[in-house]
Every structure is written in structure tokens, then in C-alpha cells.
Amino acid sequence: MATIEGIVAREILDSRGNPTVEVEVGLDDGTIARAAVPSGASTGAFEAVELRDGEKDRYLGKGVTQAVSNIEDKIVDELIGYEASEQRLIDQKMLDLDGTDNKSQLGANAILGVSLAVAKAAASAAELNLFRYLGGPNAHLLPVPMMNILNGGAHADSNVDIQEFMIAPIGAPTFREALRSGAEVYHALKSVLKKKDLATGLGDEGGFAPNLPTNAAALDLISEAVEKAGYRLGTDIVFALDVAATEFFENGTYTFEGVEKTAEEMSSYYTKLADAYPIVSIEDPLAEDDWSGWRTLTASVGDRIQIVGDDLFVTNPQRIARGIAENAANSVLVKVNQIGSLTETLDAVDLAHRAGFRCMMSHRSGETEDTTIADLAVATGCGQIKTGAPARSDRVAKYNQLLRIEEELADAARYAGSGAFPRYRSA
């Protein structure tokens, strides 16, 4: 197998105009592969550390030249000569070199950039697609695209509390048709918003970001768009939410729609919402430290709704293990930069799947043209991917990669569809 001959890192811009890390790995057989690291807006307190320079007169303190230097001055010498196929060994070398629990010494953005680029290089050297290299001969499941078509919270300058209102086209026979139906609903929503004199400006992830009287009003608008596009709500198209409740949690209470609420009151709100709309999944419905609230909500509606931990778990196997033990949530959102290495990401997915938890592969609000998560979604067979609206090239790049993968798989491809949400029963 080819060995690592050189590693180059650079500072590039993400989709929000903020710096991020890009890494190129060169092998002794002439292979060169590149990976770029995403960045979040609403970040969990327990995420691995994203190293920023902090120089206020340069990129408002968000530069990543220190992370780049850590790669070129510290990581490179440790990895030269290793076989690129030794992913776990290479990642462990970087973790040992960092020496902290949260990757604060080298930076998760430095470690992850190298980790992903090494995997891509190894796949290329083996003349395999990344999804096949990571997932093996049985990787064949195309995920349901969880399309964030209306943005609120930290992803938009609007008065809507819930961060993401997603549509999931579970009734389509293929990923290609699922993407088409999602795009058609997205365009129909723009038409609905215009007709009602509501703003059609876009949030970070390509979804519309109007001011609305209530959060439920967003679901009403999307329901109208689904009908306008000619699809059946609850059968062809269902809803999913990312509440990002930590963003409006303070001093033990949730300030939601201008009113302070307890965890029990928030849980009651979600239950009523799920009774009124075809909601299959709710992400971060409660704060990242509200373990008792998570347990209560999961016990209450977890038999019919996917309860997803993002800030709760931060793709960290230790926190996921606690969630499994305490029956807090029943699904894990998977973000490679939350944990900071490919090996740990795959370990997190494996742990969740062995416990019967579902997984949803996810982008970040600050993205690049890198499409690694599309391949990861297929490689891990998670059946769900969250990568924004069908707009903005940083989001669409992942969907387009999945189209290519489906084409490559040909007759072996299977679309997850409604099987991705076994708890949901359509009306």
C-alpha cells in the first residue's frame, strides 16, 4: 500500500466567509487527496476544540493559521512513511501527539483535516470510491435527504426559535427522485412565501428565513408548499425539526416564543406538535445538560418519534454511551468535526448502531465544497443525511455526490425511504 510522502495545509474560506482548514496528503505512488473542515454556528459545549487564532485584527479573530502551523510543524513529521491505509493508527498518533481530551493542543480542525485527507488518499490509491473504501462491499444504502428549507434560530436573522424545519421525502423510490421532490417543494415554498408577502432571503444553510408569528406557522407554510408541489403530506413528505434548544436555555428554563417554559412544558409542546403534523424526528429538543428532560421526553414519545442528540452527544462515544445507558434520546447526529477524527466518528456510529440507535450524518452551517459526509452516509448505512436546502453550492455538492454514488451502485443501490424512520406510522 502507498505510504504518506507529504502533507500540506492551508487556510481557506467556508460558506460563511470564515477561515477553515484544508489539507492535502500526497502518497509515494503519486496520489494526492484533499479535504476541508466544516465549522458550526450553534456549537455544543462538549465539542472538540476548533483552534482559532484570536487575532481580532485578522478575520475578526477567526483565523486558523495556528491550526495550519500545527499540521505542518508537528503532525507531518509524525506521519511521514506510514501506510495511508492505517487509518486507526494514524488517527491515534495524532491523538497521542495532542495529548488532551478535547484536542485543544493541536486543534480538532487540524487533526480532522489530516484524518479525512488520509482516508481519501488511501481510497484513491486503492482505486476505490470513498464510500466503498470505508463501507466495504455491502455499502449500498442511499440516505433520506433531510432538507432544511426554512431556517430559524442561530442560522437566520429572524424571530423563529426553532433552528431548522426540514422535509424528508420518504415516499420516493430512489434518491434521485427524493432529491427532485425536495427541490420542488423548496421552490413551491418560495412561491407560497412570496404570495403572503413574506421574506425569501436565505439563512446559512440555504433555507428561507422569514419572520413568523409562531413556530408552528412555519410548518403550516411548508404544508401548503408540499400540497402546491403535488405531494402527499405524511406519505410522500414528512417533517423533521432541529430545535437547538440549548440556544434559548438559561438558568434552568427555556425562553420559547417569548415565554419561559420548563422541560416538562417543552415536552408537552412537542407532543402536541407531533399530534398535529407528520413529524418523524426532533433534534436537540432540550438543552445539552438537561439529561432528566431528555429521559422524560424519550419515554413519552420515543416510541413514535426519532429523538436526536446533537449538542447532547457531540458525536462523542462516551456521551453516546451515557445516553444509551440512561435511555436519553434514540438517535445520534453525526458531525465529523465535533469529535475531530474519522476513526472516532466511525466508532460513534458503530456504538450507536449496536445499541439500536439511529444515526443521521450531518453537515455544519459553515461548509465547503468537500463532499466527504455524502460518502460517509453511504459507507455507514445510516439512512439519513442532513446537509441543508437544495440551494447554495456548498449544500448541493453533497446531494450531487449522492447522485453519483447512486449511479455508481446502479441496481445494487437502495433508497432508505420510510425504512429510515421505523417508529413513524403514516396516518
Swiss-Prot record:
Cysteines paired by S-S bonds: none
Cofactor binding note: Binds a second Mg(2+) ion via substrate during catalysis.
Chain segments annotated as coiled-coil in the UniProt record: none
CDD domains (UniProt xref): enolase
GO molecular function list: magnesium ion binding; phosphopyruvate hydratase activity
Enzyme class (EC, first level): lyase
Source organism superkingdom: Bacteria
Pathway: Carbohydrate degradation; glycolysis; pyruvate from D-glyceraldehyde 3-phosphate: step 4/5
Residues annotated for Mg(2+) binding in this entry: D242, E283, D310
UniProt keyword rRNA-binding, yes or no: no
Pfam families for this protein: Enolase_C, Enolase_N
Active site per the UniProt annotation: E205, K335
Binding of (2R)-2-phosphoglycerate, residues: Q163, K335, R364, S365, K386
Catalysed transformations (reactions): (2R)-2-phosphoglycerate = phosphoenolpyruvate + H2O
Main location as per UniProt: cytoplasm
Job description of the protein: Catalyzes the reversible conversion of 2-phosphoglycerate (2-PG) into phosphoenolpyruvate (PEP). It is essential for the degradation of carbohydrates via glycolysis.
Family of this protein: Belongs to the enolase family.
Protein name: Enolase
Gene: eno
